[in-house]
Amino acid sequence: MPRNLSRIFLVLLALGLTASCTREPENAPPDMLQHVPADTPYVFVAGKRLPDGLRARLADHYAAQLAVQRAALLKVRTQLQASDEVAAATREAGDYFHVLDALLAEFEGRETADALRELGIEPVARSVVYGIGILPALRIEIADAARLDALLDRVAERAGLSVARSSLGEQAYRRIDLGGVDLVLSVTQTHLVAGLLTDAMFDRHLPLLLGQQAPARSLAASGEIDAMIKRHGFTGYGEGFVKLHDLTGILLGKGSGLNAEVMQALGAEPIALTTGCGALAETMTAAMPRLVMGITRADDQQVVTRGVWESTPAVAQYLGKLAAPVPGVGATYDGLLAVGLGIELPQLRNALDALLRHLIAAGSACEWVDRDGLEAMIPQLSLALGPMTAGLKGFNLKIDDVELDPDTLEPRNVRASLLAAIDDPRGLLALGAMFSPGLAALEIPADGSFVDLPQDLGLEDKTPPLKVAVRDRALLLLAGADDAGPDDWPRDAGTAAPTPLFAIDYGLLLLVERFGDLSERAATQLRSQGEIEMAEELTDQVAGFRQQARLFERQRVTLHASAEGLVMDQVMELR
């Protein structure tokens, strides 16, 4: 029971993360970060007020999401209980489900921000999530203390929780015994404070959690968040980090200060690794030591987030050589779906070769490292990523539109294109001609002009008419294009910078408008055929897409390398 009840805090943590937007104009507000120890291994802080219009829309969006989570939880629990693999674990986690159900019951029917505020919750609030050692803590602004207190009482009663009440000075708090650690909840006039504290260090760490005692050195004093904002172009609307290298050291028993103190109080033994394997783990995480994330733009048109897996200069140098420019990948797009990939395979081979050799050398004293197996993989890399594949750079697939038959749900019309970036596209066609007489007889100019692909190439009868063209180092295949010409080729200006390794762009609103009703019809058909579980999954997916499409019109994700490491940008265009 204690192990499962510890997940209560994860619920509160999730609520804090959904409220990761802000009230005050400062970037990293001292009143939040002054409570955070400078040596925390992780943090996410929301410290700057969003534009009012965006903030209001997000608040209603979050409320609508929370309002349907109880029904979603019931479905998940039912599915887990029906699974032979996890049914026993689901029964053991019954207390967790009771608490979560009790909490989510409070949100049912409250589909607006104003309705949530009636519970004392501010849907879009300044907040900070951090670690007192490795144990999580949360501080979040609230709408009404008395109403939130009443909510916590109802949840505890409905879930059958045993809650001890006490106070430190004039600050009241709830304490829930979870075994070796306790969950602490404190509602002040302006904040909800929550965290896990060890039994052994409870009296020592409680003032720190409640904000009555400052850490030896705070994250506000260190300036680390401000430096991170400047380094990665964040805005202060929300940013944070996870220090992978520090966490590895803590778990290996090499932490210091508060981190070591908490581990000792937990009675946690260091991870059982030999000296050699421990050194290898530290070496590997030192190469890419920190994950950072933050908001780079937020206005009435877009919300843009960035995640960076920071690396050493040596690793960044390898990463920087991987991307191959593929026309159109990552460029602005307004159709249903675009997905593309561009990788220099010889450079990928070099990077993997260097990684394997590093593992062999650094892991010589680690029994987990299969030296012979790794050495055998090196020549295999040269075969798989050798001269035969060196000319393959990547692709860009665009699905502009798909019309489905409402009765059979099969495609009636398709408008799409597939661009393959290849050093020798004509050589690829020649290779295909060896297996297809029809393709061998086809004359394809090298100037980018399109020709029709004959239907006798072994394609299925339902395949739409296809056209193919070759230009420079690219082959372009079109489907559903009656007239094709130079405008169907991606423009040079359409190639994104920096060069993406991967990109995906999809129109949420377009997908819902095109396929939402058809998907619901498909779910109805599945139910009539007895496929209840599949029908429910499809219905839930469509409902999720519809909810997202009420706020977001498009989403785009790109992955690229920089001098900082591996960077993922996500652009969410608002309706």
Give the ranges of each region predicted by the language model.
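Bacterial N-terminal signal peptides that target proteins for export
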Residues: 1-9
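Bacterial N-terminal signal peptides
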Residues: 8-18
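Structural boundary/hinge residues at secondary-structure and domain interfaces
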Residues: 21-175, 225-288, 303-406
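Single conserved position on a long alpha-helix in the C-terminal lobe of the eukaryotic protein kinase
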Residues: 43-44, 94-230, 390-501, 570-574
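Broad, structure-driven detector of short, well-ordered beta-strand segments within folded domains
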Residues: 182-187, 279-282, 286-297, 390-402, ...
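Signature of lipid phosphatidyltransferase scaffolds
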Residues: 220, 229, 234-240, 502-504, ...
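Long, C-terminal catalytic modules of enzymes
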Residues: 249, 259, 264-267, 271, ...
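Membrane-proximal interfacial segments on either side of biological membranes
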Residues: 345-351, 427-430, 511-521
